[in-house]
Curated annotation (Swiss-Prot):
Alphabetical list of InterPro entries matching this protein: Snake_toxin-like_sf (IPR045860)
Name assigned to this protein: Three-finger toxin MALT0063C
Organism: Micrurus altirostris (Uruguayan coral snake)
One cellular component (GO) term of this entry: extracellular region
The entry's keywords: Disulfide bond, Secreted, Signal, Toxin
C-alpha cells in the first residue's frame, strides 16, 4: 500500500512538472526551446522587410501577433518549419 501511494505521488509530481514545459521551434534551422513559465503558445510570424517581402520568425509567447501568414498554437512543435 505504501509503495502504491509513493508511486502515485511521484507520478503526480512528474505530470505536474511536464504540464508547464511547452516546446517550440525558435529558428528557421529547427532549433527548439522549452518555453519559460508564462509563455504558453508557440508562434511563427511574418516580419515585413520591404514591399511584398518578409521573413519568418519563431518564438515562445504569451500572446500572438495577428497576420495572414502567422501561426499561433499551443502544442509541442506546432509552429512548424517550412
Amino acid at each position: 500500500m505504501r509503495t502504491l501511494l509513493l508511486t502515485l505521488v511521484v507520478v503526480t509530481i512528474v505530470c505536474l512538472d511536464l504540464g508547464n514545459s511547452l516546446i517550440c521551434y525558435v529558428s528557421e534551422y529547427g532549433a527548439k526551446m522549452t518555453c519559460p513559465e508564462g509563455k504558453t503558445l508557440c508562434e511563427k510570424y511574418a516580419v515585413p522587410l520591404m514591399q511584398g517581402h518578409f521573413y519568418f520568425a519563431w518564438r515562445c509567447t504569451s500572446t500572438c501577433k495577428a497576420g495572414a501568414y502567422n501561426i499561433c498554437c499551443s502544442t509541442d512543435l506546432c509552429n512548424k518549419i517550412p
